């Protein structure tokens, strides 16, 4: 699955237990203006990061805040299975949302990465 061009990061998300503190810090530090989106499960701050990937801050029961990159893949099931073959544990099986599918894996070294497959998109190798 090696390619001349790496898969692009499509979305960057901060997972935190303290949404108000994260909102204030990143707004002051980077000039981001998060937009609150109330979801059934939890509060979410959508971030406009300018050109490049989108972003968000999600409130969840984490011991420490962590940034989770969402990497664009052409086939979410294959990418998730390949990660498992390479020793990753699956934290979130491929799951459909309004705009696409996502999954989350933890690498053998403990790092986490999410895979993202949009519902409608230009093929990644067409760009």
What residues fall within each predicted segment?
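N-terminal beta-strand motif that seeds the catalytic metal site of vicinal oxygen chelate
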Residues: 1-23, 67-69, 116-127
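K/E-rich alpha-helical interaction surfaces of small helical-bundle regulatory domains
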Residues: 21-35
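Conserved active-site tyrosine of GNAT-family acetyltransferases
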Residues: 22-26, 83, 110
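Conserved short beta-strand elements that form part of the metal-binding/catalytic scaffold
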Residues: 32-66, 105, 112-118
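Conserved, structured core segments of small domains
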Residues: 46-62, 69-72, 81, 91-92, ...
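Glycine-rich beta-strand-turn "strand-cap" elements at beta-sheet edges
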Residues: 95, 101-104, 111
């Amino acid at each position: 699955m090696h390619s001349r061009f790496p898969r692009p990061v499509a979305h960057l998300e901060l997972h935190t237990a303290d949404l108000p503190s994260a909102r204030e810090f990143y707004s002051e530090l980077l000039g981001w203006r998060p937009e609150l989106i109330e979801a059934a499960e939890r509060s979410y701050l959508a971030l406009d990061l300018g050109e490049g990937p989108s972003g968000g801050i999600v409130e969840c029961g984490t011991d420490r805040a962590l940034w989770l990159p969402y990497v664009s893949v052409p086939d979410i099931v294959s990418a998730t299975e390949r990660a498992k073959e390479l020793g990753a544990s699956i934290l979130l099986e491929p799951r459909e949302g309004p705009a696409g599918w996502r999954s989350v894996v933890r690498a053998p070294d403990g790092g986490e990465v999410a895979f993202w497959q949009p519902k409608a998109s230009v093929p990644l190798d067409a760009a």
